[in-house]
């Protein structure tokens, strides 16, 4: 029956379907949780459970207030997190073990014949025809579901056979990023390391490690809390798509803009984060380093040469290596950059503990000082309280003002050799020639002086800052050499030079470099970088492009300042319980060291990628290099590093089971671990033993097992 308005009607039809919607949001209980994925957000979610199943989730907004002047941490969460509940029940998620049917049929047949598991597995892998047949089935369908016990038996049989026949160093274990789920990471790696398998590094899962953090700052990717972004008043975002990869923190970006912060985005494409940019720098992919070098050139010229910036110079003197003296090595009619001047060089300080690891500065009166804070103070047997960065002489305890540059205090100008790598290879993908172009030498003068060592020798020295000025191409005073005349001179590393590399206007490089430093001067360091894997995927990304960012920050006094800093974000590589984590996962309570290996080298050699790497290393050598390697390929350099003990590689010994090698050492009369080590070293020296890397394709030197868990090795 319908009323006259035609809007309502009375019906006898069932309305039971409404119960579905009423029950949709009912639940038995809720728990507080997060999502153990490879991100650093750690977002808090309330997970609602019904009949033992996750039915829905809700973002929580009860984070503690950090500071009344900083926006709330919430809202937190992202599209990936809100869909996480679907994954446990996805039809695409395997619920049971699966084995290639071809392999399982062979194994089941051998087991039925009365062989034990190890014998059954051995009879398959040592049969060339059957081994080839089951391996050929890879990459196709043809899985067979087996029980958990059956799968465990097959895996254990394979491991036992591999250890007995080839050695535990023929088994590799790979799993990415421990911090996203510590227990599962530890369990797998502990088991592997108790067996003596290869403990593969995990950072290469997505790109290179940011070396600059360790080499410049002494620790690995220590980044600020994301709420600290809000305090930054000048942002440069490079290689990090914040909205996409740090969604839960992206609100600080928009909030900082409301506060008046300026956002500069270095991105070849109009990415998600680019829409927030006040200045978009659409540079050629992989040319970030060139652009940043031009910014450094501008900062050095305008804030160190054209005028003195007290905040910058005070910061650089106290917190960087720029005032340290560097030896210049004579090379014909020019000089090459050498090592730092050490305390062991100077009679007054030569008796210091760890003198080779303590460095020297000078002041305006020409006096040499041993400042506190060098790494040698960190490892003194008896702490002296000098492991800090105060500008005090560690011996006399007097404060001093170090010279940042010798200009005006020099007794000579030294012509120093630098290498120009501009045209060594073409960054356009697919166009890199195999040989490339060698680096070109250019000569630039730096102010220098002579000092006398404790053994009576004379050293020509300059400061690290003077070398940086010359490297960046910043002309000063009467210094001669191949310096550019101005910003429009296309010599390294001017704004005009970067224009040819990046496709970006020189004016835009001048603008960003000037604004970055001007903001840092006025705010005492509140200029920051947010950076990530978009840069690290390139050949020199993690080492050189990142270094340019770090140098800009150091020159402008931004590191260690709220609202400043070098902020590298990728995933959750840090573990809060690191001491326990390292001991448990590495099984260090049982034996040490574990067989650690960088995964890049493992794949490079064991998948034959080195055969397809046709780039010679001509482009890598400095023009001052005196002796080049006999061979000129990355594989040769890797092999050299292994032979010299710089880099572990497994399997380790050519066509040799390390367990059998130990037995041979005992037979030879070795009674202690040290005697075994000495005996093995002697076998290598005599040529009776060789490293497996030199014949990595030999069947005896190939990996026999690779275990992958917690990650999609190929797909991601």
Where are the regions that the model predicts?
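Short glycine/threonine-rich loop-to-helix capping motif typified by GTGT followed
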Residues: 181-187, 537-546, 576-585
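Flexible, glycine/charged-enriched surface loops at secondary-structure junctions
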Residues: 166-170, 306-313, 523-528, 560-569
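Extracellular/periplasmic catalytic domains that process cell-envelope and extracellular macromolecules
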Residues: 228-230, 521, 697-702
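N-terminal export/assembly segments and adjacent metallocofactor-ligating motifs
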Residues: 1-459, 466-474, 493-496, 505-508, ...
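A glycine-rich phosphate-binding loop feature that marks nucleotide/adenosyl-phosphate handling sites
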Residues: 176, 314-319, 515-516, 530-534, ...
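Gly/Pro-rich turn-and-neighbor structural signature
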Residues: 164-168, 181-182, 498-533, 543-550
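Short acidic alpha-helix initiation/capping motifs at coil-to-helix transition points
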Residues: 444-446, 485-493, 544
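Oxidoreductase and adenylate-handling cofactor-binding alpha/beta cores
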Residues: 554-558
């Amino acid at each position: 029956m319908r009323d006259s308005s035609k809007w309502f009607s009375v019906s006898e039809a069932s309305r039971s379907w409404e119960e579905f919607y009423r029950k949709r949001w009912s639940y038995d209980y809720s728990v507080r949780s997060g999502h153990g994925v490879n991100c650093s957000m750690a977002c808090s979610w309330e997970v609602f459970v019904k009949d033992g199943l996750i039915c829905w989730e809700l973002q929580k907004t009860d984070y503690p207030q950090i500071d009344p002047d900083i926006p709330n941490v919430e809202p937190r969460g992202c599209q990936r997190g809100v869909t996480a509940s679907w994954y446990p029940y996805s039809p695409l998620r395997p619920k049971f073990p699966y084995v290639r049917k071809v392999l399982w049929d062979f194994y089941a047949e051998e087991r039925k014949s009365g062989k034990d598991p190890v014998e059954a597995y051995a009879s398959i892998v040592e049969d060339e025809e059957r081994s080839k047949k089951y391996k050929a089935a890879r990459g196709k369908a043809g899985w067979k579901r087996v029980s958990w016990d059956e799968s465990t038996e097959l895996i254990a049989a394979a491991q036992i056979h591999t250890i007995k026949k080839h050695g535990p160093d023929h088994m590799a274990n790979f799993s990415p990023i421990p911090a996203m789920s510590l227990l599962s990471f530890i369990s797998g790696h502990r088991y592997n390391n108790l067996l003596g398998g290869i403990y593969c590094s995990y950072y290469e899962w997505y790109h290179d490690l940011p070396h600059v953090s360790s080499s410049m700052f002494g620790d690995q990717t220590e980044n600020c809390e994301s709420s600290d972004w809000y305090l930054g008043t000048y942002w440069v975002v490079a290689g990090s798509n914040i909205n996409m990869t740090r969604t839960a923190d992206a609100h600080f970006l928009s909030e900082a803009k409301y506060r008046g912060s300026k956002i500069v985005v270095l991105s070849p494409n109009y990415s998600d984060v680019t829409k927030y940019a006040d200045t978009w720098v659409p540079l050629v992919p992989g040319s970030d380093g060139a652009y940043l070098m031009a910014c450094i050139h501008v900062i050095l010229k305008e804030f160190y040469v054209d005028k003195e910036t007290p905040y910058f110079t005070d910061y650089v003197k106290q917190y960087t290596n720029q005032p340290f003296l560097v030896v210049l090595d004579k090379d014909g009619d020019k000089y090459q950059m050498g090592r730092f001047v050490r305390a062991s060089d100077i009679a007054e300080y030569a008796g210091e503990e760890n003198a080779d690891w303590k460095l020297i500065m000078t002041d305006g009166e020409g006096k040499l000082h041993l400042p506190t804070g060098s790494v040698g103070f960190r490892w003194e047997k008896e702490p002296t309280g000098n492991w800090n960065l105060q500008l005090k002489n560690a011996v006399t305890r007097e404060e001093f003002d170090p010279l940042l540059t010798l200009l005006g205090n020099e007794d000579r100008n030294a012509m120093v050799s630098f290498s120009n790598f501009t045209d060594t290879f073409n960054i356009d993908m697919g166009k890199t020639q195999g040989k490339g172009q060698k680096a070109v030498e250019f000569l630039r003068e730096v102010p220098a002086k002579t000092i006398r060592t404790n053994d009576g020798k004379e050293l020509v020295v300059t400061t690290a800052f003077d070398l940086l000025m010359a490297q960046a191409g910043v002309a000063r005073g009467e210094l001669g050499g191949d310096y550019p005349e101005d910003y429009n001179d296309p010599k390294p590393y001017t704004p005009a030079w970067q224009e040819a590399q990046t496709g970006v206007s020189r004016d835009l490089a001048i603008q960003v470099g000037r604004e970055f430093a001007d903001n840092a001067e006025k705010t005492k360091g509140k200029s920051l970088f947010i950076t990530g894997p978009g840069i690290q995927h390139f050949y020199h990304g993690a080492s050189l492009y990142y270094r340019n960012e770090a140098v800009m920050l150091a020159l402008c006094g931004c590191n260690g300042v709220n609202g400043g800093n070098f902020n590298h974000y990728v995933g959750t590589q840090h573990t809060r319980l690191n001491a326990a984590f390292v001991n448990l996962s590495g099984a260090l309570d049982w034996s040490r060291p574990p067989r650690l290996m960088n995964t890049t080298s493992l794949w490079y050699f064991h998948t034959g990628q080195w055969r397809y790497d046709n780039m010679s290393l001509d482009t890598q050598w400095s023009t001052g290099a005196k002796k080049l390697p006999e061979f000129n390929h990355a594989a040769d350099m890797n092999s050299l590093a292994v032979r010299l003990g710089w880099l572990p590689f497994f399997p380790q010994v050519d066509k040799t089971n390390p367990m059998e090698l130990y037995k041979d050492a005992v037979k030879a009369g070795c009674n202690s671990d040290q005697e075994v080590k000495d005996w093995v070293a002697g076998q290598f020296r005599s040529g009776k033993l060789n490293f497996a890397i030199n014949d990595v394709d030999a069947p005896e030197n190939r990996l026999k097992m690779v275990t992958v868990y917690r990650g999609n090795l190929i797909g991601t």
